[in-house]
Amino acid sequence: MNCHVGTKDMKIRKILFGLIFVLICSVGCGPEPAVDLFSNEETSTEQVAEIEHDSTREKYNKGSCKRLTDSPYVLVIFVDDEESSWDTIAVSNYWYENVIPAMAYIEDQANGYGISLSMETGSYATDTSREMSVKYDGIISNYTGDAKATEDLLEQCAVSLGFEDEYQMHEYLQSHTGKEQIVYMIAVNKPGRSYCMSTASNSEYLEHCVLYTVYPTNKVENSMCVAHEFFHLFGAEDLYDPYGKQPRRAELAKEFYPDDIMFRRDEDVYQLSVGSFTAYTLGWTDEMPEECNRQDWWE
């Protein structure tokens, strides 16, 4: 299989990448995806009509993760850096305690809105027996206040795996899996505040999540965090006002969506739900909830 990307195309993509406005909310021709390590080979059985993008859900149908009405391929990259690493046991524990429950939860929530998702999953991780190394050259920052803190993380992961860059890896995965949408979730085995790198522009930017295993307060992260960041990739918005810009929306969310996964945390992800506004931002429904059709929700 030839996955070569032309030099001219590469330069154009690099220029486009530099012009993209990224929003932080708070992922031979190269090795085979490690679907043999952890995989779910089921495929989507149902699709719903595409919903057009509009100004009330500005990141829906944008970037590389456009619609959560089509089952995407989910790739978890377990990356090492100069101060942290993954071993086989840690990878296995994170996979079965966080990733698998999160994917099941997302599929269950989608089903409640009449959306049938059956997501295929795979992973990359350092494997000395296969001479595979997933390594970031340097220290992965856990500071989410700077949009450039980990802007080269996905690229470095791709290069360490033998690809020319993240775009070649993306094209390879699309070809290998037959999926247009690839969800990148980069897991880092150290404390930090997990976040999502997403875009509201029509661009080639490869949206992705950065997931830390431990919250800055030393609280171990769980499947709720994985699902929360996953939803961000497809347009879901925080309802708890993390940046102090929409205090009124947070008040209204507490009244109307107290158990929404985009509003609060919980040790048990099934104590949380996808409320009607979050479903709207994901494109699971095209009807704006009445309680959100008010001026102070948007101020």
Whereabouts are the PLM-identified features?
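Active-site-proximal segment of zinc-dependent metalloprotease catalytic domains
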Residues: 58-69, 83-84, 148-243
